[in-house]
Every structure is written in structure tokens, then in C-alpha cells.
UniProtKB/Swiss-Prot annotation:
It comes from the Bacteria. Keywords: Hydrolase. Its EC number is 3.5.1.49. This is Formamidase. Belongs to the acetamidase/formamidase family. The keyword Hydrolase applies. PANTHER family: FORMAMIDASE C869.04-RELATED. InterPro entries: FmdA_AmdA, FormamaseFmdA. It comes from Methylophilus methylotrophus. Homotrimer. It catalyses: formamide + H2O = formate + NH4(+). GO terms for molecular function: formamidase activity. Hydrolyzes formamide with the production of ammonia which can be used as a source of nitrogen for growth. Also acts, more slowly, on acetamide, propanamide and butanamide.
Amino acid sequence: MKTIVKLDLDKKPWEQDGQIHNRWHPDLPMIAMVKPGDEFRVECMDWTGGQIGNNDSANDVRDVDLTQVHYLSGPIGVEGAEPGDLMVVDILDVGTFDDSQWGFNGLFAKENGGGFLTDHFPEASKTIWDFHGVYTTSRHVPKVRYAGIMHPGLIGCLPSKELLDTWNKREGDLIATDPDRVPPLACPPTSQSAVMGRLSGDAAKKAAAEGARTVPPRDHGGNCDIKNLTKGSRVYFPVYVKDGGLSMGDLHFSQGDGEITFCGAIEMAGYLDIKVGLIKDGVKKYGIKNPVFQPSPITPTYRDYMIFEGISVDEAGKQHYLDVHIAYRQACLNAIEYLKKFGYSGEQAVSILGTAPVEGHISGIVDIPNACATLWIPTEIFEFDIRPNADGPKIMVPPGVDVSFTS
């Protein structure tokens, strides 16, 4: 397997021979060219570029510079790719580095990123997870062990200038409705901390000022955080520029549906083994607007779940109309309160929901006024039985063990 992106984790992202970028822009030069049918390896930094350490303090999570993220490897060109084609990407393997057998999960401070449950957990915290082959455990969250579903949280092709302008316009219009909101409604372009691959000089400055942040998923894929995009899966990406420009990063060892902690998976450095192909004029042939994918046949299978429901009624008891966001939040909060009965802190429970292979489902979307969302927690990940019984829950978490907080 040929490695076409080779990184040095002891160096900063901007010291990697132009192989890293953290903005989306059509003018980014291809760092390598491959042919349809080629198989190759791409090494990736963790999404923060090494800002988070394997330690017992959350100060680095509190102070993380979010103008830097995400650091992506690429873009990689595919010979013959043209706008309107579909780029076929087979994820052959996802792996860890031998000298980096750990990852991290964090709750961001409300003033610096926040997250899905930031009003309930506004302070920064962190958990470290150690890798044992396909399994992971944490010194900060005892009594759980689960098989990872390693995947890229972020992968996609470069946008065209027209698509980039569309993104910036629609997200700018949204920000304008509440420009002082904390956390913000969206992340507008900023040249601060921009790393523009192999662009240089005035061209790099111009692209940095208008390049799209990598934070959200968009029409091209991007930061979708889909845990099922693991080895054995296939993705069909719309192509918007000549050669396609495939970039990837934000690798996860394991993640729950929704990535509710925002820094919401077990984040890691590692590698992707990729095979690429093309379907000429595939966007028109299949009417594809956003990427579509086929899941892997080899993901871990759990047989028994505790499933928590949530409806469109918020924490204050106010009724909302078919609001899936509120319903999923309520399902998560219900699960957190349940796990606390076994001795987990709220932060430990949130970390479990963000890192374990939990399933999130929209179970009902038509029965007015309530949507119903469900959160499925596999019971087999725990070293004890979490199912209800007549004796009631018992405290199973050793005293004094918790997530890392700030000092």
C-alpha cells in the first residue's frame, strides 16, 4: 500500500510540507494525483492538530483554538474527475499509529465551542481512552469497554467557487439573525489560523479570507461524523472541481450517533486506506445532491439495548411542534439521569453517550405535536447489568474516579 500523505506528528500542521489544510476552497492545489482504481494510504492528524494531551487536566480542552480546526489531509486529485461526476471512495481500512494508542473526548466550555448539552454542562472536561486492539477503555470512565468503529469524521471533495459562495451567503444570513449568540449559529470565514495547503502569497491570503470553515457537514459531505463510514464502506461523493480534490481527517476510534459532546467521539490520529473510482456524469444519472454511502458488513453487533425515549417537550415543560432536536436532547438527558443512578457523574455519562456505539433514531415524525427520538445504549458495553430490576440500581463506579476538569 503506497502512502501518499506521510505526516510527522511531532511537527505542527503547517510544517507538514503543505499536505494539510483547514479551510475549504476550490483553489487549493492537489498534493497528489491518483488514477481510478488506485489504492493508497493517507495519514491524518487528530482534528485539533495535536492541541490536546494525554493527561488528567481539561485546561487544553478549555483553551483549544477552534479557529484552527479541522486539520485535513489533502486535497488528492483523481485523474479524469470532472464536475458532475461521482467519486467512488472505498474505505479499505482505518487504523491507529503504533506510537499513538490513545484518543480523547471532551466537553467544550460554553464560551468556546459549547455543544449539544452545553446549557447543562457548560464547563470544559476531558476523558482519555486507551486502545487495546479493537477495544477501548478509559481511566476516567470505569466499568465500560467496547469495540471501536473507527471512521473518518470528515471527508469530502473541494467545492466549486459557486458552491463556496452559496455556503458563505446562506450561513452568513443565518448568523445575521442572532450575531451575538453563544455558541454562534455558524462559523464564518476567517483568515485567523488558516492553513491553506500549498497555496502561497496573495493567493493564499485571498483563499484564507473566503474559504469555508470545516465545522459543519455540507452538500459535499464534510464533517458529517457518521460512525458507519468505517472500513468496508463505500461513499459516492459529488465532484465540483477538476480532479475532485478529496480531503479527509477528524479520525474517530468510536462515536455515538449525534456526537453529542461536540468533541464528541474518541478523537485520534491515524491513517485511512482508500480506493477511488469514478462514475462519469453520475450526479445527473442518479439525481444525487448529497453524498450517499453503503455501510460496512463488519461493524460490531450488539444484541441487547436499553432504549431511552424523548419527545418535543423541553426541560421547562414547554410544548414544541415536531422538534426532533429537542426530542433527541430529552432522550439523551433521560439516559444521563439513568446512568447517574449507578454512580456515574453527569460528565461521565455524557462521555459514554458521545464515545460508545450508541444508536440514535427518529422513531416518530408525524404524530403532532411530538416527534419521538430514541437513544439506544448497548448493555454489553458495561461490566455490570444496567437493566432495571426489583432491587433497584447499585452504585458501581469507584469513589473518586471522574473525568478531568480544569484547574
